[in-house]
Structures are given as C-alpha cells and as structure tokens.
Amino acid sequence: MAATELRGVVGPGPAAIAALGGGGAGPPVVGGGGGRGDAGPGSGAASGTVVAAAAGGPGPGAGGVAAAGPAPAPPTGGSGGSGAGGSGSAREGWLFKWTNYIKGYQRRWFVLSNGLLSYYRSKAEMRHTCRGTINLATANITVEDSCNFIISNGGAQTYHLKASSEVERQRWVTALELAKAKAVKMLAESDESGDEESVSQTDKTELQNTLRTLSSKVEDLSTCNDLIAKHGTALQRSLSELESLKLPAESNEKIKQVNERATLFRITSNAMINACRDFLMLAQTHSKKWQKSLQYERDQRIRLEETLEQLAKQHNHLERAFRGATVLPANTPGNVGSGKDQCCSGKGDMSDEDDENEFFDAPEIITMPENLGHKRTGSNISGASSDISLDEQYKHQLEETKKEKRTRIPYKPNYSLNLWSIMKNCIGKELSKIPMPVNFNEPLSMLQRLTEDLEYHELLDRAAKCENSLEQLCYVAAFTVSSYSTTVFRTSKPFNPLLGETFELDRLEENGYRSLCEQVSHHPPAAAHHAESKNGWTLRQEIKITSKFRGKYLSIMPLGTIHCIFHATGHHYTWKKVTTTVHNIIVGKLWIDQSGEIDIVNHKTGDKCNLKFVPYSYFSRDVARKVTGEVTDPSGKVHFALLGTWDEKMECFKVQPVIGENGGDARQRGHEAEESRVMLWKRNPLPKNAENMYYFSELALTLNAWESGTAPTDSRLRPDQRLMENGRWDEANAEKQRLEEKQRLSRKKREAEAMKATEDGTPYDPYKALWFERKKDPVTKELTHIYRGEYWECKEKQDWSSCPDIF
C-alpha cells in the first residue's frame, strides 16, 4: 500500500506512527472512523486501540476503556533494527538493495539518521566503511509495490530497495518521510547567505520572551488541570444524585447510559490529569536545573572570553619581547623589512590599547628585493638549450598586442574596527557562515583570487614544450608553488561569491589563455574553474573552501583536485592545495603561512613530485616559507630535487647517483650538482605603493577593472565589491546585506518549489550550475564540476538570456 494510501486510512499524528511501528505478531488492524478498533494478534493490540481512539474516539465497551490505558511501548524496527519511534528521525535495519543484473538484490545494513540514509555491507562495517549516503532533504521516495520502494535525489544516486514484508516496507517509508520532512525544515531554517546570523540582542530578547510565554502556558496548564479535576468530581456527584431520584424507567435507562459515558470520561480525564501532573512536576523540576546550568554556562563563557583576551595580550607582549631580544632574518614574518624602510610604512608600532582593535591589516613593513623580475631559462633543465623560452619575435608580438591595463586602484581607507567584538563569537565555527563587514575584505571575490593562480601561466607554456616528462613535471611543480606567492601579504578576506556568480579573464591576445570561474555551490561554498591556452594546455579545478577560527589563528583548508592537461602529449597531472594559516588574529601583526604536502601525479607516465611546505617557526634556523621537493619516476628513482620558498623562487637540481663502496649506485640518488641548478620561477616585484592597495600584484590590480561584454553575473558588476574598492565602505556594507537577503529569498523559493514537487509526487531538479556540469571525473573518479562549454560563444553573440539575476 502506498504511503499516501496509508495516511488516508489512519489519519495524521503520532498515533498513526505508533501503529506502524507496532511490534506484534501481525500488523495492527485500523479501526473505522466511528468507534471500536480491534487490534491484530499479539502485542499489536495496544497499537490498534490507540489508532481507533485517534480515528474516531473511544467506542463503548472494553475497546473504549483501553484507549485510556497506558501508551504502548516504543515500536521496534523490522529485521532487528531500531524503529522510527516517536520522532521518526532514526532507524536502522536490513534491507535488500538492487546492485546489478548479475547479483540482483543484495542484503545491506541501512542506517537512517539526521536526514541521511547510509548503507553498509554489514552492521560491523559501520565503524570504518560507508558504502553510500543519500541526503533525504532533496530526495524523492516512491513506493513501487507491497515490498519495493525507490529513493532518488534526481541525480547520480538512486536506491532500489526491497523490504521483507509490506509492514516492514511501510515502517521504513514512514520513517523516511518523517526524516525527510525534518531535514527539509532544518534546511529551510538554515541561512543561505553564506553568513550565518549571530545571536544578536534582538534574538536574545525574543528568546527571553519565548521562555516567559512557555512559563505562562505551563501555569495555565496547571490551572486547567485543577479545574478539570474539580468540575469532573462535581459532574459525577450530580449524576449520582440524579440517578437516586425516582424517575420513569425510560429516563432511568437514559441516565444510566449518561452515567456510563461520564464514567468513561472520568477514566480518560484522570489519565490525562495524571499525565499532565507528571509533566508539570518534571518540567518544574528540570526548569530550575536548566536555569542554573544556563547561568553557569553564561558565567563560564564570560570568564573564557576574558581569559582568552588576556592570554592574547600576553602572547603579543612575549612576541615583542622576543623580537627585541633576538635578531631575526629579514624575511621572517615577525620582522619583514629593515629599519630604513620604516619611514615608508606610514605608521609606527601600535600601542597596547590599539591592539584589541587591530584589524586584518597586512604587515606594515616590507623589503622588496632588487631586480626581482620573472627570469626565464631554457626548457632543458640541465641548462644546455633554450627551446622553451619565448624567442625575441614572439616577445615583440606580445608587447605590441598587449592591452594597457590599470596599474593602481583607490588606496585602502584607514577604518578602525573592534576585531575582538566580532571574532570572539566565531571560535570553532565555519567562517563562511559568519556575517562579516566588508572591513575584513579586499575588493576581489574568491573567483578572482582563484584566477590569480594563472599569474605565472608562462610556466605552463614552457612545460607544454618540454619533451621530457620529468622536466615537464618540474615546471608544473614550480607553477603549483607560484600560486601561493600572492598570499604572502594578502591577509584580507575575499568576498564570498553569490550562487551563480561568474568571473571571466580573457587574455587570449596578450598571453594566449582565457579563464572562466563560476560559483557552483553555496553551502558548502564551491567554485569551478576552467582555463585553456592556445599554447597547449588546459587547467581545471573545483575548490571548496572550509575555514575554522581557532582563537589564535585561522585555518583555511581548500578541498578539491586541480587538473592540468597538456594537449600534445596527453600528460594529465593532478594535485591538491595545502592548508593556509593566518596567525595573530586577535592581536599582533597578522602573517600567513602555508604548510603541508602536495603530491603531483602524471597519470599517463606514473611520474610523481612530492612538495613539502615547511611550517614557519620562530625557533627554527631554516629559511622562512621553505619548500622542498623531489621528482621521481614510476620506480621511485629520484631524478630532480626542488628547493626554494613559496613567496620568492623555486630552483631545481639534477640528481646524480652516488657510486657506492661496491661500485653500485647508493640509494639511486646523490649530490645536487651545483652546475645543474636551474631557476624555474622567481616572483615578480609588487607594484609601487602596493601596501596601500591591499598588496595586490600587477595581475590582481587588473582583475576588477570594468570590461564591456561580460556576463551580467560577472564579479566586476557586483555592487558591494565595487563600492568597497572605491572606498565607500558604509554603502558597501548596506549593499552586501541587500544582496545576501536577495540570495536568501531565492533559496527559500527553490525550497518551496522542491517541497511542492515532493507533495505532488513530481520530480524536481535541484539547482544546477550554468556553465559547468557535475559528473564523475574520468581520471580521479570524483564527482566534480567540468566546463560544459558555450560561455565564449554566448559572449560573442551577447546572448545572456540564461543568466540568473543575482545582483
């Protein structure tokens, strides 16, 4: 029987759920709308009676009296699992899942919890391996026949399931429907804006009003309890007195029936009164405990905030004392620059009073090495030839076709902001869900920051011309490291893109490549990126940014795989990003570090490169921001060693085998011959007055420059970002709130459409990206967004009719 048919018989409410979960030997028989409900055999009797009471009220006789008795025990799920119970939000047990045409249906252990349905091959497997999970908030549940049902999210996940019996199937379907309703409700209550609402004073006032209302209702319930008992006793006494009077036989019969019904009413009322009394006692007892616990937690939070603030100040004093007592290298985060440069910073050291108001300012002093241009070397890493370097004719053509780009933006205003008042509520939270004013931002979106990975695109141009795959891998590794060079002083936060926001960068004439980014998901925030070059390479990635504030530092973890494909050879490289850490969030000078390892793999040849980003330490004698690496062939033999820093340069050395005592190669790796040293990459100098322009590089300064013909969803057209770039921060904050509210309304509209489609039993397509398609990657087998094409064709025709209105 379909779920809709079952709901029509029993009617809504917990009684129906209890009947479905009844643990008797047979299914409970649902009583008619008029009265008596006869239960099925076994302990299902109690459930059958409760359903009868819910459907039409107690009937005469024992059936009606039973309804006032104790409630049935919580039901147990079929096949040895726990049932949906009263909440219908958790269940586990065995079901048969369709696998393929060879194996057919296979027995699997299913677990329903928190709106997610997961399955395992066995119950023991729950500890370590989940075979699949589907989110019920966006899923459709369809009943096929007495035992079979289907769960599908309209995408790649569809479960064809079979229960052992119709009753067991219905228990699962009911539990799934309830879990789905709860998941959809929770989703509707979540904040779409990417900036989760913090607990404001208005929220606290509303919470206190709610508590007062609840207390008032509990008192009303207590009063009604006493009134029911009082009037019930008076009614019974009046009926008894009426029965003792001498009246005609017909009247006596009627009075007797009324008395019987009054007796049943008294029994039912007494049961309700007892339940109310127990609830009141329990609520009053626990209310006092909860109030004490709440007050205790409030006091603890205040003490924790005060302690943390004090520790942060002490830490800042210790750092200053350490810097004063120790001479650090010029390139450490704590001492960037020389005394000669301090006059150019525009401000001196902040006082202790200013520390707690310190904002995401980048380091104040910076030493720019002389002649820090991007130097090109030959493609042959041994240094013998220069096949890969651009010839003079090509350089001349580039200079002629190069468009004039802007070289400056309005200087950053000096607005003060109490950072601690905001950040103390963010400890341990995902920062993409915390509302932040634009004071924390730089006037670029995350899509534009992602495009900055292409700043040193010529490394891929050189790699595309390499004939040796191991040499090619060295240039790919240098390109990977170069993408972090723009972060060294960039301590401000980019704008969170709106869902559907895009950013294009067309440098086909000047540099031979063009790039497109699109925000394909909002929670979790994810951006897809595709860049293609006429010089023989394609770069694509989908990056999800997760971040956590730990009190003293902020961790930013990019999740996702980056792909680089070279057209001529078919070499396909993949790698992932390392963790970025922002230190001294509360007080002290902010500084950024990169740490972790990157494994770059050539999926065609099996060559690998392992890069290690060494975390900075005040007490280490190592070079700050150090990166080391090795390039190996499929057998594990090391051919090249890489050395450098992620903020300045990368070099490589050809590894020569050392002759062992017995004449053989020792460990197949040897000294790094000085004559084989090749400079793979060196950072370009920052523009003049970069410290006043958010430390933007030459490329970053051009990214938000207005261009004609872009899509209406392009980041350059985002009004709050443009206002911030122009120094109108108050207006930018107001505009940011408007855009977030508009996005929130769009999300609620989609959810309402999904809910209606679910109620109507019609399929609903969830949100899909416009220019990217989510599918399984042929190399990594991961689900990712891959460019579907048509963007540049639409731009040429200026046909943007399919673009959403997000600004």
Curated annotation (Swiss-Prot):
Residues 88-181 form the PH domain. The modification N-acetylalanine is found at A2. The keyword Oxidoreductase does not apply. Cholesterol binds at Q314. PROSITE patterns: OSBP (PS01013), PH_DOMAIN (PS50003). A motif (FFAT) lies at residues 358-364. It comes from the Eukaryota. The modification Phosphothreonine is found at T377. Changing D278A: In a colorectal cancer sample; somatic mutation. Transmembrane segments: none annotated. Its main location: cytoplasm. Ergosterol binds at Q314. The modification Phosphoserine is found at S190, S193, S198, S238, S240, S338, S345, S351, S379, S382, S385, S386, S389. 20-hydroxycholesterol binds at Q314. Lipid transporter involved in lipid countertransport between the Golgi complex and membranes of the endoplasmic reticulum: specifically exchanges sterol with phosphatidylinositol 4-phosphate (PI4P), delivering sterol to the Golgi in exchange for PI4P, which is degraded by the SAC1/SACM1L phosphatase in the endoplasmic reticulum. Binds cholesterol and a range of oxysterols including 25-hydroxycholesterol. Cholesterol binding promotes the formation of a complex with PP2A and a tyrosine phosphatase which dephosphorylates ERK1/2, whereas 25-hydroxycholesterol causes its disassembly. The FFAT motif is required for interaction with VATA and proper localization of the protein. This is Oxysterol-binding protein 1. It comes from Homo sapiens.
